[in-house]
Amino acid sequence: MVNAIKGVFVSCDIPMTQFIVNMNNSMPPSQKFIIHVLDSTHLFVQPHVEQMIRSAISDFRDQNSYEKPTS
């Protein structure tokens, strides 16, 4: 018997994977979205969180970008 689960395959570098795993761990148990951690750079997540992950990564990158100070 085969069990099929609909989800989204996420491929990213190791720091982004850790960021997504940390997001998942900070959620209450009923809202956890990672179905399976495939390896250090690939995750299988529930399809309804794709946009939330994209937004969180975008915000994270904006916060970590360097802006040259104006003198």
Swiss-Prot record:
Highest taxon of source: Eukaryota
One of the record's GO cellular component terms: transcription factor TFIIH core complex
InterPro entries noted in UniProt: TFB5-like_sf, TFIIH_TTDA/Tfb5
Keyword Transcription: yes
UniProt key word DNA repair: yes
This protein's UniProt keywords: DNA damage, DNA repair, Nucleus, Transcription, Transcription regulation
UniProt xrefs under SUPFAM superfamilies: TFB5-like
GO biological process, one term: transcription initiation at RNA polymerase II promoter
Pfam families membership: Tfb5
Subcellular localization: Nucleus
Subunit field text: Component of the 7-subunit TFIIH core complex composed of XPB, XPD, TFB1/GTF2H1, GTF2H2/P44, TFB4/GTF2H3, TFB2/GTF2H4 and TFB5/GTF2H5, which is active in NER. The core complex associates with the 3-subunit CDK-activating kinase (CAK) module composed of CYCH1/cyclin H1, CDKD and MAT1/At4g30820 to form the 10-subunit holoenzyme (holo-TFIIH) active in transcription.
Function text: Component of the general transcription and DNA repair factor IIH (TFIIH) core complex, which is involved in general and transcription-coupled nucleotide excision repair (NER) of damaged DNA and, when complexed to CAK, in RNA transcription by RNA polymerase II. In NER, TFIIH acts by opening DNA around the lesion to allow the excision of the damaged oligonucleotide and its replacement by a new DNA fragment. In transcription, TFIIH has an essential role in transcription initiation.
Protein family according to the UniProt entry: Belongs to the TFB5 family.
Protein name: General transcription and DNA repair factor IIH subunit TFB5
Species for this entry: Arabidopsis thaliana (Mouse-ear cress)
